[in-house]
Amino acid sequence: MAGNSIGQFFRVTTFGESHGIALGCIVDGVPPGIPLTEADLQHDLDRRRPGTSRYTTQRREPDQVKILSGVFEGVTTGTSIGLLIENTDQRSQDYSAIKDVFRPGHADYTYEQKYGLRDYRGGGRSSARETAMRVAAGAIAKKYLQQQYGVKVRGYLSQIGDVTCELKDWDQVEQNPFFCPDVDKLEALDELMRALKKEGDSIGAKVSVVAESVPAGLGEPVFDRLDADLAHALMSINAVKGVEIGDGFAVVTKRGSENRDEITPDGFQSNHAGGILGGISSGQHIVAHLALKPTSSIMVPGKTINRQGEATEMVTRGRHDPCVGIRAVPIAEAMMAIVLMDHLLRQRAQCGDVNSQVPRW
């Protein structure tokens, strides 16, 4: 009802605000006997962590995760896993000026309309700070998927503004602060970020995420289609305004003879569908893309109103990302992993005894 949970068999519930004491989550449905330590979660948290480069917010949070429950002697017990991350670098005074003013493009106005009040410190519950817990939970899912099924989930930045980044080299993604797989575009990205910082403005981005070695058969008919659940999960990430599966909106200009993924005894000849047919995984790579809007927390003055409905002007102070898409890469990976683990457990529960004789590649 309150919208703080996702998943059925693998269920993640988060809590906490940007400037509260801590962030946390409860992860239900993890099978027993899975080796798990805080170090397993910390790697992805460090990839998402703020203050790690000059291209992201300079809020410096260590994001050290604590496992509170559900793990004993280094393995999961099958009970609820409790995770906690303390907030240590809040500067709430940066937000005192917006206590009675709505930042244009943010959730200030809509939260006030829904609840009749709001935590104005850094956006409260609507802040992307909440996604730290998704990344922690997603790291559990990623480890399970890799260990039990050989599934690898990884993402990359595919576009910032007009600068597109081709998937040339996965190894490059972890070698630069942009999560960019195209080393030839790093200079252009750096120049764009410097220009935005000088202008006090921001820019949108596109992130791509790929899951390899996903078994065929995941997904439920009609309302719990795998692509529907992936779109739901990815759209729930802050600032995301659009999600594509496979070729997405590009299929509008394609002919059926071009778009269909033909099959031969050697396997599928293309993957326009992004690894999902009829809402069920085909065994191909699952591919999704998400578009993130430019943050509205910028130094460029903008028109807005106060709580009394009076016109005023807003210039956002504080520490903010010029492009929120950069740190969205590990978040997108986490959300895809959470959905895939949930559907793998659902498939195992209902169809674990199914042994199809149809070839798989």
Swiss-Prot record:
InterPro entries per record: Chorismate_synth, Chorismate_synth_AroC_sf, Chorismate_synthase_CS
Pathway as given in its UniProt record: Metabolic intermediate biosynthesis; chorismate biosynthesis; chorismate from D-erythrose 4-phosphate and phosphoenolpyruvate: step 7/7
Reactions mediated catalytically: 5-O-(1-carboxyvinyl)-3-phosphoshikimate = chorismate + phosphate
GO CC annotation, single: cytosol
Cofactor note: Reduced FMN (FMNH(2)).
GO terms of molecular function: chorismate synthase activity; FMN binding
Task of the protein: This reaction introduces a second double bond into the aromatic ring system.
Family: Belongs to the chorismate synthase family.
Subunit-level organization: Homotetramer.
Protein name (record): Chorismate synthase
Organism: Pectobacterium carotovorum subsp. carotovorum (strain PC1)
Gene coding for it: aroC
